[in-house]
């Protein structure tokens, strides 16, 4: 071990120990197609082992944003990896792709093997939920760039779809119906506003349980992002899904139009799904306007699917049989953007 490097703030031995601790978590994510083992210079995946005829690879990358600041404050790191996976796999899912493998990038101020293991444990959990193999990653110790207690995490997902079964949204027409899948809470967006409203302005305590919650505020805020892969793929296989949107940063206003062809808009039936209490809690403390809420947060709907009216019952049945809470939340009309009960929010 280099004492000079350690004196500069980089502990190579701690890094080795972290990798050793990761291995059991990586191992449980293995799936058909994975080649090699942890420690190579690149992760390998044999696409020919799968039954795709005209495979198209679909990739996505994302991070967790300032939700990490709450993990630091709570010293709770075992769910943030789920968020990193969810943000990526739900994106590739929106085009009908089956996630195949995942890589993570973890930058830390100080290599703490126990903390790193907790983070990677969450990544592995997210990979299991999505059917992804964790085939590689990078853990970089960066003293001077991050404090000893800080880190950042990003993820990279690669999925596959048959070329003629990719869901692009181009088949969506006026009259299509919109199905919303319930979120688990805030997911991984809007946390700069969350922290300003609840921590900076209201000075609430993360370890205190406030009405109407049954657990400390910090745990409520750190609830991991829901992963929609398995139920949605089951619905996609029916061939009845014409468009999908992952409701992330920008909320309904920015994300639903991304799946719509030009000249079409989404009319949302406000009140057609239950909005989790964390959102009214935030709105009350921050005195936030409704348009702010729908522009920033998922408001209880984390994923949206567009289907023809004649397919609605079948698709909802498939989703619910896989444990999803699915709601008819609106329809596609001529126009632009998103309206709520006929009133535009901007």
From Swiss-Prot:
Subcellular location, principal: cytoplasm
Transmembrane segments: none
Pathway given in the UniProt record: Purine metabolism; IMP biosynthesis via de novo pathway; 5-amino-1-(5-phospho-D-ribosyl)imidazole from N(2)-formyl-N(1)-(5-phospho-D-ribosyl)glycinamide: step 2/2
UniProt xrefs under InterPro entries: PurM-like_C_dom, PurM-like_C_sf, PurM-like_N, PurM-like_N_sf, PurM_cligase
EC number: 6.3.3.1
Entry keyword set: ATP-binding, Cytoplasm, Ligase, Nucleotide-binding, Purine biosynthesis
Cellular component, GO, one term: cytosol
Gene Ontology biological process: 'de novo' IMP biosynthetic process; adenine biosynthetic process; purine nucleotide biosynthetic process
Highest taxon listed in the record's lineage: Bacteria
Catalytic activity: 2-formamido-N(1)-(5-O-phospho-beta-D-ribosyl)acetamidine + ATP = 5-amino-1-(5-phospho-beta-D-ribosyl)imidazole + ADP + phosphate + H(+)
Molecular function terms, GO-annotated: ATP binding; phosphoribosylamine-glycine ligase activity; phosphoribosylformylglycinamidine cyclo-ligase activity
Intracellular or extracellular location(s): Cytoplasm
Family: Belongs to the AIR synthase family.
Name of the protein: Phosphoribosylformylglycinamidine cyclo-ligase
Taxon lineage: Bacteria, Bacillati, Bacillota, Bacilli, Bacillales
